[in-house]
């Protein structure tokens, strides 16, 4: 479960104060798929940074499975990101001199996981994103959609409880973006991983179970959506 309790985040001081998040409260259950939308500067990405412990709240509490993220030490916060949270960004951030397999396994190698376990987890992650047949290829030989799927596999290889996806379709065309969102929805359903998506695109936001629209850091609208995987009519419309 991810919960915000009257969370505010203020940057700057004096005449340059920016209230990125303003008294925001919500509770996302484990296994949920939620989307945050809103105009540029509405605080969407800051919400993800707060969850990951990349920035502390100015006031309020950010809870991940009951643990107060702001109360964690730097080492505890780093461990949360390394072992519990997978991050997917607009930029793929793949290392071009490594193969797809090596890119996916890198988080585990850096965490000291033994090689046999690395190999098994990488195989599982590549299969989950339908890239097992491209394991030996370098990122420069993959399409944009394949590179983003590879980035998702890298996020999944740690077997996270939470996926934070910040504009993951931003560098993809419409068709590849829809394929990616289908994949993220499928992964949420098959693995039970909690997904929090940031997107400015209402079409991609509609893949989520719930959409929170932020305006100037505050909750402007909260919409519960029908789960399209269980609604053939909406699935066809997609």
Predicted feature descriptions by range:
Residues 1-207, 214:
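ABC family nucleotide-binding domain
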Residues 218-238:
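Conserved beta-strand-loop-alpha-helix hinge in the C-terminal portion
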